[in-house]
From Swiss-Prot:
Name listed for the protein in its UniProt record: Tamulustoxin-2
Source organism (scientific name): Hottentotta tamulus (Eastern Indian scorpion)
A single Gene Ontology CC term: extracellular region
GO MF assignments: potassium channel inhibitor activity; toxin activity
Entries under InterPro entries matching the protein: Toxin_32
UniProt tissue specificity: Expressed by the venom gland.
Disulfide cross-links: C2-C22, C7-C31, C11-C33
Cited function: Blocks Kv1.6/KCNA6 potassium channels.
Ranges that cross the membrane: none
Protein family membership: Belongs to the short scorpion toxin superfamily. Potassium channel inhibitor family.
Keywords on record: Disulfide bond, Ion channel impairing toxin, Neurotoxin, Potassium channel impairing toxin, Secreted, Toxin, Voltage-gated potassium channel impairing toxin
Localization, UniProt: Secreted
Keyword Disulfide bond set for record: yes
Amino acid sequence: RCHFVICTTDCRRNSPGTYGECVKKEKGKECVCKS
C-alpha cells in the first residue's frame, strides 16, 4: 500500500515499492501515492 512520506527530491526514494508525486499540502509538501 501507499503511505505518506515527507517529500524531498524523489518520492520514489522515500517510499520504496510505491510510486507517487510531490503534492503541496497546507503544512509543507508530502509525497502521495497515485493509483
